[in-house]
């Protein structure tokens, strides 16, 4: 099986990109594929589902991963002409417009996480990830992918050299009135 995470399933990423990736790769048509949308955690959820399937004995082999090319997703394309929430959800939250970014703001405020604290945590997280990568901690977890530009053998999402000072220069991602979380922190 193939389980793929993708939050913005529109345009090139629409329908069931997990299944289409199987076909585009030239794999046999009998290999199924599915796509998971759990917002920012889609790829992690795909991996979790794959691990659960193998651990439970339901599958022998599952390929898991994720895809998202935000530059190919038109801004606002996930919204239709209607509301993304039904009347019961809107009633429950007094017609308050919410999303994951606003949720991060609310959590930061509720638990007293300052912008500095969030930036410190982000910088430390990337520093630790880089050290773990350098020590080979992820080598048995990543299968090399061969591209025209050469093999990809490491997680390229780690931002080496990230500092609190650099992060403090980034604008808040979700509010314009002094919010805390930036894209790097969430």
Where are these regions (language model features)?
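Active-site-proximal alpha-helical scaffold in enzymes
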Residues: 37-67, 108-138
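Conserved catalytic cysteine-centered active-site region
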Residues: 4-60, 95-102, 168-186
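Short, well-ordered secondary-structure micro-motifs
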Residues: 13-15, 73-75, 154-156
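Glycine-rich nucleotide phosphate-binding loop and flanking beta-alpha elements
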Residues: 10, 69-71, 129
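Flexible glycine-/small-residue-enriched beta->alpha junction loops
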Residues: 51, 55-110
């Amino acid at each position: 099986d193939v389980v793929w995470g993708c939050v913005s399933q529109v345009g090139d990423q629409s329908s069931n990109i997990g299944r289409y990736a199987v076909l585009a790769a030239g794999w046999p048509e009998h290999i199924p594929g599915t796509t998971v949308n759990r917002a920012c955690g889609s790829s992690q959820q795909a991996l979790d589902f794959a691990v659960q399937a193998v651990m439970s004995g339901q599958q022998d082999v599952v390929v898991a991963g994720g895809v998202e090319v935000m530059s190919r997703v038109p801004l606002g394309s996930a919204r239709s002409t209607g509301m993304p929430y039904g009347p019961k959800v809107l009633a429950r939250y007094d017609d308050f417009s919410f999303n994951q970014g606003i949720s991060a703001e609310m959590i930061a405020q509720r638990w007293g996480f300052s912008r500095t604290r969030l930036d410190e945590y982000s910088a430390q997280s990337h520093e630790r990830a880089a050290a773990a990568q350098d020590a080979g901690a992820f080598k048995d977890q990543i299968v090399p992918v061969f591209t025209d530009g050469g093999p990809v053998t490491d997680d390229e999402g780690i931002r080496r050299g990230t500092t609190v000072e650099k992060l403090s220069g980034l604008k808040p991602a979700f509010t314009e009135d002094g919010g805390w979380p930036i894209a790097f922190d969430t």
